[in-house]
UniProtKB/Swiss-Prot annotation:
Subunit structure: Type II secretion system is composed of four main components: the outer membrane complex, the inner membrane complex, the cytoplasmic secretion ATPase and the periplasm-spanning pseudopilus. Forms homodimers. Interacts with PulL/GspL. Interacts with PulE/GspE and PulF/GspF.
Bilayer topology: Single-pass membrane protein
Pfam family, one: T2SSM
Keywords: Cell inner membrane, Cell membrane, Membrane, Protein transport, Transmembrane, Transmembrane helix, Transport
Family according to the record: Belongs to the GSP M family.
Topological domain spans for side Cytoplasmic: 1-16
Protein function: Inner membrane component of the type II secretion system required for the energy-dependent secretion of extracellular factors such as proteases and toxins from the periplasm. Plays a role in the complex assembly and recruits PulL resulting in a stable complex in the inner membrane. Provides thus a link between the energy-providing PulE protein in the cytoplasm and the rest of the T2SS machinery.
Subcellular location: Cell inner membrane
Periplasmic side: 37-161
GO cellular component, one term: type II protein secretion system complex
Name this polypeptide is given: Type II secretion system protein M
Length: 161
């Protein structure tokens, strides 16, 4: 500290004024770039976020009557025929239905040998469509690992049990 004071006193009055002016400019620049500018940038981001959130809130308020209206509507009352659902999902999962025979509220099916994973995915899709598996018996196909022959498959609608 003593060395800095000695250096300061060795300078002429003009050099001291220039050094003080440079220190003030440096201090102003430092305050501007470390405090003021980041604050302004954050404030602009906050304003944008606030505007976006207010727009979202306004949109949500506009959608409230529509949501209430849709909530009060009843779902369509014409469910698909079970055979239509079964055939559509079988085609989607790559299975071939050989025979589909109604037995009261149940359906007996004959399916060509198929990949076990595809069969399970198909039965899961039918379950999501409201069909349950009443009876299922399969045997492995000896020449094709992962393939099964469906010996017995009886399906029924979940709401008709």
């Amino acid at each position: 500290m003593h060395n800095l004071l000695a250096l300061w006193q060795q300078r002429t009055r003009r050099e001291r004024c220039l050094l003080l002016g440079m220190a003030v400019v440096l201090l102003i620049g430092l305050v501007y770039y470390t405090l003021w500018q980041p604050w302004q940038n954050r404030e602009a981001q906050w304003r944008q976020t606030l505007a976006r959130e207010q727009a979202s809130l306004q949109w949500m308020r506009q959608q409230t009557p529509l949501i209430r209206q849709l909530r009060n509507q009843k779902p369509p009352t014409a469910p698909e025929e079970p055979s239509t659902v079964i055939m559509r999902e079988a085609a989607r999962h790559g299975l071939t239905i050989v025979r589909l025979q109604p037995q009261g509220s149940r359906l007996s099916l004959t399916v060509q040998p198929a990949d076990f994973q595809a069969l399970m995915a198909w039965l899961d899709a039918l379950g999501q469509a409201g069909m349950t598996t009443a009876t299922l018996a399969v045997t492995a196909v000896a020449q094709q690992p992962g393939w099964v022959t469906v010996n017995t498959l009886v399906l029924e609608r979940s709401d008709e049990k």
